[in-house]
Amino acid sequence: MFKKEFKFNLKSLIIWTTITLAIFLLVYLMYPTIMSSENAKMIDELVKIFPKEVLVAFNMDIASMDSAYGWLKSEGFVFVLLITGCYSGIMGSNILLKEENDKTIEYLHNLPIKRTTIVLNKVLVGLINITTLILVLGIFNYIGLTISGDFDQKQFILLSITPLLSSLVTFFICLFISTFTHKTKKTLGISLGIVLVSYILNTFSAMAKEVEFLKYASVFTLADIRNVILNSSINPIMIIISVVLSLIFLLLTIINYNKKELV
């Protein structure tokens, strides 16, 4: 079952990875030209116009845009969070519903294995695919930065790991939600909504202390990119919260899936 599930999801993994790598490739090819001395001055002047709250929200107050690595720290890794978050949400909302959606549920009924095993096999495929996407992006960006100029390697490695913390929780939340329906159309919108709302809440929470509490409702808070940029370390509390939330939603998924009427 694991091999069948892995092969089925391999195509989407390749498509998502290829498109994302193509975007980053364009950045590395075009950035040296865009950031000529004159353009760099213009961008610096433009940045000064932005309110401080906006600069903080996009880490532009602690990361200069005059290099590809600076762009990665301010906007690039936000893009990675969104891409990996959307991919994780879509996979979480689809992977348990594939047979029901395709009207091939008899395949699962005929398997001599428990439903818990079915869930764990599908979860394993999801974890491998999400990790692979993040790993490939990290390796590609490492090569791109090595060619384009100097960068803090330790900081970069930690930044490349942080999307896992938010992506895994997103995956398990959407996986749990999928146990309440039989159609992927219903869960797809919800999963993307969770990602986009989380991003908006996380962005707004960084703009003012009055709304800082919003970050506690966002999965992207777990990635904590700003802390990594400032301290070159990942807050262990975020790792613990990510693992605990993932395990809780996995347990809830198993319980609910075992009770679900498969049609």
Regions found by a protein language model. Give the residues of each.
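Secretory targeting signals
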Residues: 120-179, 233
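A structural motif at transmembrane helix-loop-helix junctions in multipass membrane proteins
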Residues: 164-196, 204
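Transmembrane helix boundary and interhelical loop/hinge segments in multi-pass membrane proteins
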Residues: 89-109
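Terminal transmembrane helical anchor/hairpin motif
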Residues: 9, 26-69, 180, 193, ...
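Long, hydrophobic alpha-helical segments
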Residues: 72-95, 192
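Hydrophobic/aromatic residues in alpha-helical transmembrane segments
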Residues: 85-92, 140, 172-173, 219, ...
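Aromatic- and glycine-rich beta-strand/loop motifs that create alpha-glucan
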Residues: 1-21
